[in-house]
């Protein structure tokens, strides 16, 4: 995992904002993918790792769910019909009740341009698909551990 401002890295996971700012007061994670089976598989993985996780396949329900449930992290697919992950990230960043959440892009779109768009939209991290459980868990566990340790 890399933390820097670059979108040029060949790493499979990039983190652009220090994870400590997400402040995981709990281990709630919202997973969003229009492919329901993918969202549910990721949900099961995260639950097995001790996270409280909800999965959505409807991008139009994300902002309301995030405001109501207050997850510390939202994992978003980028390409979804009707409302893509980039626009969702912008909307979550624009709302005072969701602007602090850790936003993780999980997507097959991993070119330099794709990463730059994700960063500009407000994502904190980018995990390239095909996603292995370890990739996402590295980001989420780091965020949760940093909260337990307190701000650096």
Protein language model regions, located:
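Non-catalytic signal-transmission and effector/linker regions of two-component phosphorelay proteins
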Residues: 1-30, 43, 134-152
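Charged docking surfaces used in two-component/phosphorelay signaling
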Residues: 40-48
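Short hydrophobic/Thr-rich beta-strand motif most characteristic of the beta2 strand and flanking loop
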Residues: 50-58, 62-65
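Receiver (REC) domain active-site loop signature in two-component systems and cognate sites
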Residues: 80
